[in-house]
Structure formats: structure tokens, C-alpha cells
């Protein structure tokens, strides 16, 4: 079946738009020299690698799922067990069996296990899960040395649509076809789109793809003056980093605003909007100030009053249309819309000279660079105005700086000193908040200090200085007397013959104590190193910021892309070292570097000039050699001085200059990364930076000594600005790494800080900076430790007398108990509040931090609801103008998640079924605590539409009495919703009785709204009510299914039909066709239909009438009273009558006598109206009394009491005559220690429920016992069998002797004519389902595959004792009925013939497929013979076998 389903799934996948795909790769095993090949959905093997073969192409479609490009299905396994087969499945992001991860040394396996993707063991052709981690479990991307995660998943963020910019889900289903890429299907305009859930047909959520397609220019607004394109994504809800990723997917970037005209244009463009939009401005770098993503200069300021806030973590900026398009800084993890920008950034084109057009010729004391001359005036300090005049007198101007290379030249070669503070030409004197160069050149580059430009305290800080150890910029009051830098155009364009710098050979450049040479050939890292060695030099090292600046100015403007440095981790992966024996004192990594990359380090040119990338050492690039200049006196070795001490309880080693201390805090005292950094700074230190294994071992010793195993600690590691990789917050080099495997992964684009796990591996992980952790501080040896800061007041908010926490104008209650949403809200309202409404990031952050520190791990309900049309509303009716959804949320899972919770670990929100018990947050205004509680609004009475049944304030209708009404669970729910209702939620025993009462005439089970689709074993009502009442049938949930796993049974039915468990619940597969029950609220506009009672007081139900007698009598007097009123004391023969009786007595809340009694029938409980006891509903520990009368208690269960007690009682009238049992015919059943035969009429029956068999095996088991599989010839026999198997329903269903022959005729195995049938509705069905089972729960028949494993029923005639008298005459026909047939007879041979051919006719291929499903029952080496004969304890004798096989040959023509 699985094969057919998957092939059907594949057949509907159309050709969709194929992206030019670096995402695709081949999975390669180096030892086998073979690639994974998906031959079919159930066969994943290997083959000779062929990059053109679609069947060998795979790609990641989520962070942990790999999809076959050919089949659009995902790699998965049926179970997390050794030797499970890896095959292809419909992609399911929630399935644990489809989640893969890369492990150390190219191992690849199921996530969270030590089971690896393996090929070649045990000569198995298919890929398997295997515990071994040898070479056959190691996989790479074909053609590379990289593991499979190097081609990891990149989320594609959708545009417009109705999914709030959610990530495209691949593959997704549209009109029952599957798409693995963006498509234009269904659109006349050709626009490419994607579903944002896997099933668009169900969820209807979509967005357009961030790709170029015909008409995609309409997604952009073009400024007619500049030609720049802008895209306003106001409907999206993404974090800052996600928004930037979305822009970059369109070859754009987040908005940068460099001109006043641009801001005015955007103000008009966004004027109709009100909520904030992300722009590219940020202060993510720990070393520099405000900057635009993408590198545009930050020269125009448009801050909202009060912004930028200095609050830690508010590092990203939004443009707020509702506040005149002003800017404000927020936490980067907030989810907002955003603006993308594409095109030139300036109206004034300006060409920065390249290294090839650099003229020379400058006056004395001036330094040449790229066509200009520069000079620092340090001693003669002037205010900015006079410094400008002085530069102009010399023929120049205050320096303008237009690139990182020019900046680094000034910083490194002009004699800049760390304590300098020098005027440059940037200022906003002419136009406030709009910086310009005094020489009139365009502003193309800025390099601000942290927190700059500030216009601090609203002072007129209109001029700019270059200051500090890094030479970054700050705005200052122009009247301060400072030094200054002048710049002028080169005086001469004549090329001066190049001479040798002092102490260097010709062609080498001098800087400080060293000479440098740019290599002339493209070389690998090794060849470049050899070349430098031959020049008596070495590949360059970089000791500090100044040397880096010199090298940037040396190579940054050159046309080559990379230049090798001497840094690599080839000796020890993860630890970067220079080729010479020098300590790594400085690093300058590019974005995403070094990450998990291993290799050699090269310096980049161009826009990212000077930044370092890790490349394959075999790549070819130019290089820079370095050696000591001649005549330089090398600095002496440092003299040994006594090592400074560390503060008490701090750890260190002689190999580091730092002291370290752990701050392992309780839950209430953990901090965010920013708070931890500020704490460490306050005591004179910094968050720890780990630069070697020695320092890591120091921290490990601290962990072991304090017992802080497995705790998580903040490090100073942070992913800074978009142009940088991970950096240490103290500015030290990132030369040593110890990332956990697969990290850093920036999961969901919100992980920008580093933590260390306190286990022996000491591995690092990137995580959301707002997470609460312990932390590790470091301090320089010998430095004085400052006092620890006192906690801020807001860390310990005041609390009211009744336990509510006060924050601003509101009070909050944080529950410790879990409740459904309805109960939680009732509690809040009882205490003059409601579930919390969250209106701002600060409020969200306060609540999140409080529950993180003080609450449990479970989420908390807040006061948001999601309507059926997926709109958001606050319960108090206030406007939704702030949201904080977690990534991928709301996902409307199962279309029944209408409530919202806040995650404890992140503060983000998730949609959830309202009936799922959670903690909750109540909110009330400070002024509400003295208020009077609002009166409860009475329920408005109303009626139901025709055909619906009224019970209290609900209307019910049962569908399924007509076969065409039956539906799958999802279709049934949609049908109910179409009737303005939902599938029924049964909230108490009274409602259950009402439903059972109305299902009396059903022959079907009926869907309810209960399901565990979203979370296995967590059953919830789809309408969102709490699950406070259940009525599971015996063995449910999780009763056995024929050829179905328990996990497949996710939806719940009320059992109907003539089962003794009618009215109880059973979980079943959601796609099976069943009846269903809809529920709606009453309609106040409809009248309530009055109920009438007949004059005689008897109400008809079914074929009987009942009357509740409201007077208390002893049992015997009650019986007499009923007889005097032409009725009898009521017998209750099935669950329906029980529900009816309980509903009649429930309003009076008193017990009632019923007709069950044991004191009149020799202590056997029987119905006094002579009906057979086939149904009981005993209460716990009943029946207690041996001789007693029985009453129905107020809870509907039956209990025993002495008959002289006085109760109400139920009388019953009925024209039905109790069925009499057929007389037992003479004879007896076989006696055996192994088998227990049960007599009925003229036959004996054996019920086998403990050992299941296929139909063929069951047939021969019966034959071995001298019987045959049961034939059912009368309704009485059917009732007898149903009664006997019903108690066994939780064990198995039972084979009977009916089969379908090749002509399609149904026959009994013993050749009896088919004169009676009892098919389940919808059966018989299926071309290959040729054998019949009797369902234990209902007694009905259904046909299934003959190789399924079931219990079975054998039948044989009673054995007649021999008699010596001649008075009894027996006919031949009677003799045939009563005499058991000998095993070697032709009848037995005929049976065996049928059995053999039925099994063959059932299909060998399908048999072996089912053998796999039932591996626990079927021997591994099953053959045709031993499957049929040799599973039993006894095998046929030789003579029997000979006779049987001979008869098979003789009778073969009769069957085929």
C-alpha cells in the first residue's frame, strides 16, 4: 500500500520553475567512490557518480531535511533503530524520522542519535541506519572535501501574499500537485509564488518569491529623480536579520538613507502606513558606531526624539511611518515590515582612484597616496574653522576620506597616534543632521566610534574628529581647539622613478620595522609560502590594527580578489597559527568567518578591503611577503618580572595574561548577553574571550571545582556588524575556535552571541543574545577588581498583597498551575483582570524576563485570539499594533490553533489550541483592584435549525445515516465549519449521554473534534475547549489496528452500531470515511421547540416506551407497581438505552431501580423480563453483593443494594419478545489441555486470540484440529460469535472461512452454501482483499488481504457418542454434519488446495510487502511450505502430505 501511495504522490508532481541551483549536491562516499542514488520511493541505493543524473541530486529543504530532487520526497526512516532502511517519504517538517545532522569528520546521521547513514554493510544494497561510525558512514558533497551541511538550507522569505513574509515551504501542494520550487501555476500574470506551508490547498497561505521574473519590477517603487528602487514590505513580520536576508535574495539590501531628498521621498511613500519598518541602520559592531548595512555612509540623521536609546540590545533601527517616518532603535529580534533598496546610493558619481592611477609628487612633510597628499598638524591646535583656513592656505582642505583604504593609509602611515584627536573635514554646519565634506566631495565612507554620531545632550556637535586607538570618528563642538589633518591634490603627475624604501630591497615597501612585497604570481598557499621563503621572508603576519591598516592601503585598491597571509589552521583544525612562530595577537575576519571553515586565510580587496576570508589552501591568489628591515634593532626579549596576581577565587594559567571567574547563578539571576557584558565591564573586566586551549582548560577547572556541569555560560563572542564575522567583545583576535559540530548555524536568523557548554567538550554554540544565561568574566592580571553593581530596581518589581507583580500602570499575575484558556481567563476575570494584552517590546521583554526567571519551562497564555479567518484580536478589544511571533509562527497547525502563548525561553509567541493546558499571565490596571466584579452575562436562550438536536446551549446534528454523508476527519470538520459550527466537543458525561442517545439507529462510528494531530498522545478538541472529560473505549487510545501503526490513529470517533461499547471513544486514522457529529451554538432568533410527554407518561425510545416513576419504593414493590401499569421494571439492553435512562433520571439526581436482580435467580444476575444479559454498566467494584437488586446510580453506572431499599424506578413497555436460545443438540466437544471448545447448537467452536496467523495458516491450524475455519450460516450463529469475541476486541479481529475465488465469487472454505452475510458498511471492497475477518467490536465482516495476521475461529460438528440401540436412525446428511472428517480425506485435501491457491492468488509481491510490516510475526526465512505448514507445533505426517499433494494436482483444474 505504501508503495502505491508514494507512486501516486510522485505521479502528480508537475514540472515547476527550476532555479539555477547551487543548492543541489550529490552525496558521496569516498571509500566506496559512489554516490547515493534514489531509484524509487522505496529504494535508495548507490551508483557510480553522475552529476547529470536527477536521481543523484539532493538538496536541503529545511535546517534538517534533505529532499530528493527527482522525486520531491525527503530522506527518512520508519524508526530510529539500527538497520532501519533509508527511503523517501512525503516531506514532513515535524517528523523526527526525517531530521538529519552532520557530525564530526563527515559523519551523517539521524538527529540526536548515534545512528548513521550507511552503505555497504552486510552486502545490503539499500542505504541503512547503522550504529557503526566507520568509513562507510562518512559522506561528503561530491567534488569537494566538505560535509553535507556545507550546502545547508537557506530560507527563502516570501513577499506580499497573505503569510506575513513567511519562509517558502518546499515542497508544497497546490491543486493536489507538488512543487519543489517557485511556480507560476494558477496565475495568469506569470508571477512566481510559493506556499508557506506544505499544503496550500488546506491552509491557503502564500507569498511571491524574491526572484526575477516577468513583471517582478512591479514589486518595486522607482524614484523618478534618482532611478533608485524601493520595496515596501509592510505586511511582513521578520526580524532585522531576516529582513536583510530577504533583501539580499533580491540583489538588494535594507534601506540606507544618505540624502534628504531620499528621506522625503520615503516619507511620502510610507505615509499611509502606521507600523515600523526595518531599515539598514545598525550598531551591531562592538567596535564601531552607527552604520548602514551594505556600506553606505552614515551621513544623514533622522532620529525620533529620544532616540537612539542607549538601552543594551537596541542595535537595529526602524523607520516609523506613524511618527513622520522618523527613526528609532529597537531590539533586532522584533518582527516588523521592512524596506529594501536597489541601485546607486548617491546622486553625485565619484570615482575612487585605483592603485594603477596613483600619481606621485608631494611637498616636504606631506605623504602621497592615490593622487593626494596628506599631513597631520598635531602640535598647533585650532578650532575647526581655523584648522580649515590653515589647510586651505596650504592649497588643500581638511581631509576628506572616501574609502577604507584611504582611511587605513591615514591611520597607518601618516604617523597617527592612539591619543590623537584630529579634525577632519566632515561636518553638518550647513544643514543640521546632514554631514558633508568641507572640500565639497561626496560622502562615500564613514567610520564612527561606538555611540556616534551623538549630538550629545542636544549640543551643537557639528564637526567631526578622528580619535582613539582605532582612529574612528566622533562629532564634537566645533569650538574645541584640536590638531587636524590636511589633504590636497597631488602637485605633480610626473611618475617618479621608484626607489627602494630605507632598509628594504627594490620593489619592497617599508612599514614600521618591516618590509613587504606583493607577490607577482597567482599561487597556492604552500607555493606562496615557498616563494616568500626563497626571498628570505615569510607570508605576512598581522600584529595589530596599524599593520592591518597598512596592508589594506597596500592591496585594497588592487584588481586581484585575494592576497594570502600566513595564517591557517592546517596543523590543528580550529586553531589558527602563523607560518612563523609568532603569537596571533590580532584578527580581522570578514562576515561569517571563520565559522566552521578550515583552510588558509587571505585578505580581501574591494568593498570588503582588508577583511579576512578562509579559503581552500589549494586556491590560487597573490600574496604578501614580509621580513625585518635591514638596520632595525629588534626589540629585546622581555625581561622576566614577577607575574601579577589574580583576585581571590579567580582562575588563570601562566600561559595567559587573563584571570577568569564563573558566575553560575540561580534562575532568578541569569542575564542576557548585553547585561552580562555590562556586569563584567562594571567590575573592571570583560566577558571572557578564549584564545587557546590553555585558557579553555582554566575555565574547565573552574567548572569542575564549582560543580557547574552542563550549565551554559555567556562568552564575549558576538557576531557584530553585517561586514564582520564573530569577534570577541574585548577586541582580541579570534584565533582559536571550539564550535559544537554544526555550529554556528544562526538558527532562524536570531543567533548572534556565543555561549559555552560546561561539559568536557567545552563546545561553543551561537544563540539569541536575549537568552538568559550564566556568564564568565575575565580581568587583566594585576588589575584592581571593582565592586559588583547592584541590581537595577526593575529586576525586582514590587508585588501586591495578593501576589500580583506591578509594572508601570498595570499589575500581572503569573500562574504556577496549567489551565485551558477558558479556565485561565475565568480566573483572571474573577480577579478583576483578563489575560495579558501586550502593546510594546518593553512590556513583552518585562513579561518574558519575569517568566524566564520565575516560571517553569512551559509557555504562558496571553490574551490574543486568532479568528477563523486568521485575524488577530486582543480579548479586551484593543487594537493589535504589536506582535512578536516566533519564526514560523503562527502556523495555524491543524487549523485549530486559535489561542496564543509566549515561549518562556525567548519571549516570542506561538499559536496553540485553546484546550491545551498552559500557564497563563493575567493583567489588570492599577485602578481596577477596588472595582466591583463584572456580573456574568447570562446566556441568551435560543433554538436550533430543523434537523438539529438541542441540548442546553448547543445544537447537534449527526451525519452518516446515508453512506454518501461519510467523510474523512478533515472533510467532516470543513463540512461542519460550512454550517457555521465545528466537529462536536463533548465536555461532560451529560453531553456524552445526549450524543449516545441520538446514535441509537447508527450503523457507523462518528467523528468528534478530538485529535492528537499536533502533538502525539496529547488529545485536544479542534474547537479549542479544554479536555476535562473523556470516555475512551476499552484499549483506547492506542488500540490495535489492522496493519496500521498507533501513530497513524490521530482522530477520535464515537463508536456506534450494535457494539456493547457504543458511545465510547476510539482513535482511528483521520482519512477513513466515517459519520460525523457537528455542533453549533444555539441561535437566539430561533424558538426553542417545547418537549411534550404522552398522557400515560411513557416516552417511546426505539421499540420500547419508558416512564420514570417519581416515588420511592422497595425493588419488589416497584416491580409490582410497573406490572399494575401494564409494564415491567425496565431492562437496559444496550448503551443507547442506558444513555436514555440516565438522561431521564439525571435532572432529579436520585438513583432508580432497574430490572436486574440475583435474589430471584439462584444468585445469578438476570433480567426479570427474561432478556439475556449481553450488556452491563457496572460501577467500580460492582457487583458487590451476591444476592441483591440493582439500581442505576446518579452517575449512570449500576450498583447493587438490598432489595428493601426505596428508590425511584423505571418502567418499560415493549412488544419485543426476548429471543430464546436455540436448543443444544446432542453431542460433546473435544477435551484438550491446549484447546477449549465452546458448544453452540450442533457445533463446537474454538477461538484463538493469542496467536495471530495469516488466513492460510489459520485454515491449516483448524484443519490440524479436525475442524475448519468457521462458516456462519444463521443470524443466531452470528450473534453467538459476536457475543463471544466482543470481550476480545482489544486483542484482535478473527478470520472466518469465507474467501473470494478467481471468478470474484464469495465462498465458504468448507463448501457450505453462502446463505447469510453480515458485511460492514462499504464492504466487501478491494480487488486483492480476498479473505474475510469478523470484527470483534461489532461482529460485522470486512474483507482484507489474506496475508494479514489475525486471530481465528475454528468450527467442527459435535462428537456423538456411539450407541448400541437401534432405535435411533441417522441419515447420511446428518452423519456428514456430525462426524469430523479424517485428515487424509479428499475434503481436507480440497481445503488445502483452496488455501494454497488463495495465498497464491493474493499475490506474492504483496505478501512479502506485508511480511515486512509484520516482522514480529513472520519468520525471516519464510518459504511457501513452512509458511503454510511448519509454523504449527505439529506437521502433517508423510502419508497425509502425499495424499494432500496428490489431491491438489487432481483438483487444480477446478480452481484455476
Swiss-Prot record:
- Which residue ranges are assigned to the Extracellular compartment in the record's topology? 20-1388
Offer one Pfam family short name for this entry: Lectin_C
Q: Which SMART domains does the record match to this protein?
A: CLECT, FN2, RICIN
Q: Which GO terms describe its cellular component?
A: cell surface; endosome membrane; plasma membrane
| Gene Ontology biological process terms in this record | cellular response to interleukin-4; cellular response to lipopolysaccharide; cellular response to type II interferon; receptor-mediated endocytosis
Stretches in topological domain Cytoplasmic: 1410-1456
Annotated GO molecular function terms are: cargo receptor activity; D-mannose binding; transmembrane signaling receptor activity
Protein name in UniProt: Macrophage mannose receptor 1
Q: Where is the Ricin B-type lectin domain?
A: 22-142
Q: List the disulfide bonds.
A: 35-49, 74-91, 102-149, 168-194, 182-209, 247-340, 316-332, 391-486, 463-478, 532-625, 600-617, 680-777, 753-769, 828-922, 899-914, 976-1078, 1051-1070, 1122-1211, 1189-1203, 1262-1354, 1331-1346
Q: What does this protein do?
A: Mediates the endocytosis of glycoproteins by macrophages. Binds both sulfated and non-sulfated polysaccharide chains. Acts as phagocytic receptor for bacteria, fungi and other pathogens.
Q: Which UniProt keywords apply?
A: Calcium, Cell membrane, Disulfide bond, Endocytosis, Endosome, Glycoprotein, Lectin, Membrane, Receptor, Repeat, Signal, Transmembrane, Transmembrane helix
- Taking every annotated instance into account, which residue ranges of this chain make up the domain C-type lectin? 225-341, 369-487, 511-626, 655-778, 807-923, 951-1079, 1101-1212, 1240-1355
Residues the record marks as carrying a glycan: 104, 344, 529, 926, 930, 1159, 1204
- Tissue specificity annotation: Detected in macrophages.
As given in the record, the signal peptide range reads 1-19
**Gene induction:** Down-regulated by interferon gamma.
Organism, by scientific name, is Mus musculus (Mouse)
The residue stretches assigned to a coiled coil in this entry are: none
Q: Which Gene3D superfamilies match?
A: 2.80.10.50, Fibronectin, type II, collagen-binding, Mannose-Binding Protein A, subunit A
What membrane topology term does the record carry?
Single-pass type I membrane protein
Q: Where are the transmembrane segments?
A: 1389-1409
Location in the cell reads: Endosome membrane; Cell membrane
Q: Which residues form the Fibronectin type-II domain?
A: 163-211
Instruction: Tell me where on the tree of life, at the top rank, the source sits.
Output: Eukaryota
Amino acid at each position: 500500500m505504501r508503495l502505491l501511495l508514494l507512486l501516486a504522490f510522485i505521479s502528480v508532481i508537475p514540472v515547476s520553475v527550476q532555479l539555477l541551483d547551487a543548492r543541489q549536491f550529490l552525496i558521496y562516499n569516498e571509500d566506496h567512490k559512489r554516490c547515493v542514488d534514489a531509484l524509487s520511493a522505496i529504494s535508495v541505493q548507490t551508483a557510480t557518480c553522475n552529476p547529470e543524473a536527477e536521481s543523484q541530486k539532493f538538496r536541503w529543504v529545511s535546517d534538517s531535511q534533505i529532499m530528493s530532487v527527482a522525486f520531491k520526497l525527503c530522506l527518512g526512516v520508519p524508526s530510529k533503530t539500527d538497520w532501519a532502511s533509508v527511503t523517501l517519504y512525503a516531506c514532513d517538517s515535524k517528523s523526527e524520522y526525517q531530521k538529519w545532522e552532520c557530525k564530526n569528520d563527515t559523519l551523517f546521521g539521524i538527529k540526536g542519535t548515534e545512528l548513521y547513514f550507511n552503505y555497504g554493510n552486510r552486502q545490503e544494497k539499500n542505504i541503512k541506519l547503522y550504529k557503526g561510525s566507520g568509513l562507510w558512514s562518512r559522506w561528503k558533497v561530491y567534488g569537494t572535501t566538505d560535509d553535507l551541511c556545507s550546502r545547508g538550507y537557506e530560507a527563502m522569505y516570501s513577499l506580499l501574499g497573505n503569510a506575513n513574509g513567511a519562509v517558502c515551504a518546499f515542497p508544497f501542494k497546490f491543486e493536489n500537485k507538488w512543487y519543489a520550487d517557485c511556480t507560476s501555476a494558477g496565475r495568469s500574470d506569470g508571477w512566481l509564488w510559493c506556499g508557506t506551508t506544505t499544503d496550500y490547498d488546506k491552509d491557503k497561505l502564500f507569498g511571491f518569491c524574491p526572484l526575477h521574473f516577468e513583471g517582478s519590477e512591479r514589486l518595486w517603487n522607482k524614484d523618478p529623480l534618482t532611478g533608485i528602487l524601493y520595496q515596501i514590505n509592510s505586511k511582513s513580520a521578520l526580524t532585522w536579520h531576516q529582513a536583510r536576508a530577504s533583501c539580499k535574495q533580491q540583489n538588494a539590501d535594507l534601506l540606507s538613507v544618505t540624502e534628504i531628498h531620499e528621506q522625503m521621498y520615503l516619507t511620502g511613500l510610507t505615509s499611509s502606513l502606521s507600523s515600523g519598518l526595518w531599515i539598514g541602520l545598525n550598531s551591531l559592531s562592538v567596535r564601531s558606531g552607527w552604520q548602514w548595512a551594505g556600506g553606505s555612509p552614515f551621513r544623514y540623521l533622522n532620529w525620533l526624539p529620544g532616540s537612539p536609546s542607549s538601552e543594551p540590545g537596541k542595535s537595529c533601527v526602524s523607520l516609523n511611518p506613524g511618527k513622520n517616518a522618523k527613526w528609532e532603535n529597537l531590539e533586532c529580534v522584533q518582527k516588523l515590515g521592512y524596506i529594501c533598496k536597489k541601485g546607486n546610493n548617491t546622486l553625485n558619481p565619484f570615482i575612487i582612484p585605483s592603485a594603477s592611477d596613483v600619481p606621485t609628487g608631494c611637498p616636504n612633510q606631506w605623504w602621497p597616496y592615490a593622487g593626494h597628499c596628506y599631513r597631520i598638524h598635531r602640535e598647533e591646535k585650532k578650532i575647526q574653522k581655523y584648522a580649515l583656513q590653515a589647510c586651505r592656505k596650504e592649497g588643500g582642505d581638511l581631509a576628506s576620506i572616501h574609502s577604507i583604504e584611504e582611511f587605513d593609509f591615514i591611520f597607518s602611515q601618516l604617523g597617527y597616534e592612539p591619543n590623537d584627536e584630529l579634525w577632519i573635514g566632515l561636518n553638518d554646519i550647513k544643514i543640521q543632521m546632514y554631514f558633508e565634506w568641507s572640500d565639497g566631495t561626496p560622502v562615500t565612507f564613514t567610520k564612527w566610534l561606538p555611540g556616534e554620531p551623538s549630538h550629545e545632550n542636544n549640543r551643537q556637535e557639528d564637526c567631526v574628529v578622528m580619535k582613539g586607538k582605532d582612529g574612528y570618528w566622533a562629532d564634537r563642538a566645533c569650538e574645541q581647539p584640536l590638531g587636524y589633518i590636511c589633504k590636497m591634490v597631488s602637485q605633480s603627475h610626473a611618475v617618479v622613478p621608484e626607489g627602494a624604501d630605507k632598509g628594504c630591497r627594490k620593489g619592497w615597501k617599508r612599514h614600521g620595522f618591516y618590509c613587504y612585497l606583493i607577490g607577482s604570481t597567482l599561487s597556492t598557499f604552500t607555493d606562496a609560502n615557498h616563494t616568500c621563503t626563497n626571498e628570505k621572508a615569510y607570508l605576512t603576519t598581522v600584529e595589530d590594527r596599524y599593520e592591518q591598516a597598512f596592508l589594506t592601503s597596500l592591496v585594497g585598491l588592487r584588481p586581484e580578489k585575494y592576497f594570502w597571509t600566513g595564517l591557517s589552521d592546517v596543523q590543528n583544525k580550529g586553531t589558527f597559527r602563523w607560518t612563523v612562530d609568532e603569537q596571533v595577537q590580532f584578527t580581522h575576519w570578514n562576515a561569517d568567518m571563520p565559522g566552521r571553515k578550515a583552510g588558509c586565510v587571505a585578505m580581501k580587496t574591494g568593498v570588503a578591503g582588508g577583511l579576512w576570508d578562509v579559503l581552500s589552501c589549494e586556491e590560487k591568489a597573490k600574496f604578501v611577503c614580509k621580513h625585518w628591515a635591514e638596520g632595525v634593532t629588534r626589540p629585546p626579549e622581555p625581561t622576566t618580572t614577577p607575574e601579577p596576581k589574580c583576585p581571590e577565587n579567580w582562575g588563570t594559567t601562566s600561559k595567559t595574561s587573563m584571570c577568569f571567574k564563573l558566575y553560575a547563578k540561580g534562575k532568578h539571576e541569569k542575564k542576557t548577553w548585553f547585561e552580562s557584558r555590562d556586569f563584567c565591564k562594571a567590575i573592571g573586566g570583560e566577558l571572557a574571550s578564549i584564545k587557546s586551549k590553555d585558557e579553555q582548560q582554566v575555565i574547565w577547572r573552574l567548572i569542575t571545582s564549582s560543580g557547574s556541569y552542563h550549565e551554559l555560560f555567556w562568552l564575549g563572542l558576538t557576531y557584530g556588524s553585517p561586514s564582520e564575522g564573530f569577534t570577541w567583545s574585548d577586541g582580541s583576535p579570534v584565533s582559536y575556535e571550539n564550535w559544537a559540530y554544526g555550529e554556528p548555524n544562526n538558527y532562524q536568523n536570531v543567533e548572534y552571541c556565543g555561549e559555552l557548554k560546561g561539559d568536557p567538550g567545552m563546545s561553543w554554540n551561537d544563540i539569541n543574545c536575549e537568552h538568559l544565561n550564566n556568564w564568565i568574566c575575565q580581568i587583566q592580571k594585576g588589575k584592581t577588581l571593582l565592586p559588583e553593581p547592584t541590581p537595577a530596581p526593575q529586576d525586582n518589581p514590587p508585588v501586591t498583597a495578593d501576589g500580583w507583580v506591578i509594572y508601570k500602570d498595570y499589575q500581572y499575575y503569573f500562574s504556577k498551575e496549567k489551565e485551558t484558556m477558558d479556565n485561565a481567563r475565568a480566573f483572571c476575570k474573577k480577579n478583576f483582570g483578563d489575560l495579558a494584552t501586550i502593546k510594546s517590546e518593553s512590556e513583552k521583554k518585562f513579561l518574558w524576563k519575569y517568566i524566564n526567571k520565575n516560571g517553569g519551562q512551559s509557555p504562558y497564555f496571553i490574551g490574543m485570539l486568532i479568528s477563523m479567518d486568521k485575524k488577530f484580536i486582543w480579548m479586551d478589544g484593543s487594537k493589535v499594533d504589536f506582535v512578536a511571533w516566533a519564526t514560523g509562527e503562527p502556523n495555524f497547525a491543524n487549523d485549530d490553533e486559535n489561542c496564543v502563548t509566549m515561549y518562556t525561553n525567548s519571549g516570542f509567541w506561538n499559536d496553540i489550541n485553546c484546550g491545551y493546558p498552559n500557564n497563563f499571565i493575567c493583567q489588570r490596571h492599577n485602578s481596577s483592584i477596588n472595582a466591583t466584579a463584572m456580573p456574568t452575562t447570562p446566556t441568551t436562550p435560543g433554538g436550533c435549525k430543523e434537523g438539529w438536536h438541542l441540548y442546553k446551549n448547543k445544537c447537534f446534528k449527526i451525519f452518516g445515516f446515508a453512506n454518501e454523508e461519510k467523510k474523512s476527519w478533515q472533510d467532516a470538520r470543513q463540512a461542519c465549519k460550512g454550517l457555521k459550527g465545528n466537529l462536536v466537543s463533548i465536555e461532560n458525561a451529560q453531553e456524552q449521554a445526549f450524543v449516545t442517545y441520538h446514535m441509537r439507529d447508527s450503523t457507523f462510528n462518528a467523528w468528534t473534534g478530538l485529535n492528537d494531530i499536533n502533538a502525539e498522545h496529547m488529545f485536544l478538541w479542534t474547537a479549542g475547549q479544554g479536555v476535562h472529560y473523556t470516555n475512551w473505549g476499552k484499549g483506547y487510545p492506542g488500540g490495535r489496528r489492522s496493519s496500521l501503526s498507533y501513530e497513524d490513529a490521530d482522530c477520535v470517533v464515537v463508536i456506534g452500531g450494535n457494539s456493547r461499547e457504543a458511545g465510547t471513544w476510539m482513535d482511528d486514522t483521520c482519512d477513513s470515511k466515517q459519520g460525523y457529529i457537528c455542533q453549533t451554538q444555539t441561535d437566539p432568533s430561533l424558538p426553542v421547540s417545547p418537549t411534550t410527554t404522552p398522557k400515560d407518561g411513557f416516552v417511546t425510545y426505539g421499540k420500547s416506551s419508558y416512564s420514570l416513576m417519581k416515588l420511592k419504593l422497595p425493588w419488589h414493590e416497584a416491580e409490582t407497581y410497573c406490572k399494575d401499569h401494564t409494564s415491567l421494571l425496565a431492562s437496559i439492553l444496550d448503551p443507547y438505552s442506558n444513555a436514555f435512562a440516565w438522561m431521564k433520571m439525571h435532572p432529579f439526581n436520585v438513583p432508580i431501580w432497574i430490572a436486574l436482580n440475583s435474589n430471584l435467580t439462584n444468585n445469578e444476575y438476570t433480567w426479570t423480563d427474561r432478556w439475556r444479559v449481553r450488556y452491563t454498566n457496572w460501577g467500580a467494584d460492582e457487583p458487590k453483593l451476591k444476592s441483591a437488586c440493582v439500581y442505576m446510580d446518579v452517575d449512570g453506572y449500576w450498583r447493587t443494594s438490598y432489595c428493601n431499599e426505596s428508590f425511584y424506578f423505571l418502567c418499560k413497555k415493549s412488544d419485543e419478545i426476548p429471543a430464546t436460545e436455540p436448543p443444544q443438540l446432542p453431542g460433546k466437544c473435544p477435551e484438550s489441555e491446549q484447546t477449549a471448545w465452546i458448544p453452540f447448537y450442533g457445533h463446537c467452536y474454538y477461538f484463538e486470540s493469542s496467536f495471530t496467523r495469516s488466513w492460510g495458516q489459520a485454515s491449516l491450524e483448524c484443519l490440524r484440529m479436525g475442524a475448519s475455519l468457521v462458516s456462519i450460516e444463521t443470524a443466531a450463529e452470528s450473534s453467538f460469535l459476536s457475543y463471544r469475541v466482543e470481550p476480545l476486541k482489544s486483542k484482535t479481529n478473527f478470520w472466518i472461512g469465507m474467501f473470494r475465488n478467481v471468478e470474484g465469487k464469495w465462498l465458504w472454505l468448507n463448501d457450505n452454501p453462502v446463505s447469510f452475510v453480515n458485511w460492514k458498511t462499504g464492504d466487501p471492497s478491494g480487488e486483492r482483499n480476498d479473505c474475510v475477518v469478523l470484527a470483534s467490536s461489532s461482529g460485522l465482516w470486512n474483507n482484507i488481504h489474506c496475508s494479514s495476521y489475525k486471530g481465528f475461529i475454528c468450527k467442527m460438528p459435535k462428537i456423538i457418542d456411539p450407541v448400541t440401540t437401534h432405535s435411533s436412525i441417522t441419515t447420511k446428511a446428518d452423519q456428514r454434519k456430525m462426524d469430523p472428517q479424517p485428515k487424509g480425506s479428499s475434503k481436507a485435501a480440497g481445503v488445502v488446495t483452496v488455501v494454497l491457491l488463495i495465498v497464491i492468488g493474493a499475490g506474492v509481491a504483496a505478501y512479502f510487502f506485508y511480511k515486512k510490516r509484520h516482522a514480529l510475526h513472520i519468520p525471516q526465512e519464510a518459504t511457501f511450505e513452512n509458511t503454510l505448514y511448519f509454523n504449527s507445533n505439529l506437521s502433517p505426517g508423510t502419508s497425509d502430505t502425499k495424499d494432500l499433494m496428490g489431491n491438489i494436482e487432481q483438483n487444480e483444474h477446478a480452481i484455476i
